[in-house]
C-alpha cells in the first residue's frame, strides 16, 4: 500500500471511528456531518470522498461492526475444535455473538436501532474493510456440509436474525422478560425448530 493509499485509509478509519463514537453517545439523529468532521479533524469535503451522507456512514458502520461480530464468532468456532452438527454450529455462532453484545451494550444499542434486513444482508456479502469477512461464503460452506439440503436458506437465516435481534435487545439491556442467561435455552430451542423446519432431503 502506497503512502497516498495509507493516508486515505487513515482518514476513512478516523471518520468511521469518530462517527461510531458520536452515534453511540449522541445518537444518529443528533449527530451532524459537521460534528463528525470537526471531531475527526478533517475537512467536510474529505467526508464526501468516502460517504454520501451520514446515513451512508451509519450503514457502513453497521456493516463493519456486524462483520466484526461474525468474524469473532467464526474464529471462536474454528478454534473450538469441537465436532458439532449443523444446528450446533449455527447456535454456537449465535451464542458467541450474543455474548459479545452482552459485553458491549453500546454496540448492541447502535446495531439494534439501525439494523434492517437490507443493511444486514449487504453487511454479510459486501465487506467494507479488508479485515471484514464475507459471511455469504462461510454460510454457503456450512450449508454444503449440512447432512441435508436446506430449503430457502436465506429465509432461514432471516428468521434466525429477526428472532435473535428482537428478543435479545430487551433481555440484555433490561432483563425483560428475563435475563439473557435464562432466555438462551428457550431461544436455542426456537432456533433448532427453525432449522429443522427448513431441513429438506437428506444428502446421499
Report the location of each language-model feature.
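N-terminal intrinsically disordered/low-complexity leader segments
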Residues: 1-10, 199-204
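Helix-turn-helix
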Residues: 14, 22-56, 60
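Pre-recognition alpha-helix immediately N-terminal to the DNA-recognition helix
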Residues: 14-22, 92, 96
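Amphipathic alpha-helical packing segments from all-alpha helical-bundle domains
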Residues: 74, 119-147, 154-158, 185
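Hydrophobic alpha-helical connector segments
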Residues: 60, 75-103, 157-160
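Hydrophobic/aromatic-rich alpha-helical bundle segments in the mid-to-C-terminal region
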Residues: 144-190, 202-204
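Alpha-helical DNA-contacting segments of helix-turn-helix folds
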Residues: 58-68, 72, 111, 131
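Short secondary-structure transition hinges
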Residues: 99-137, 173
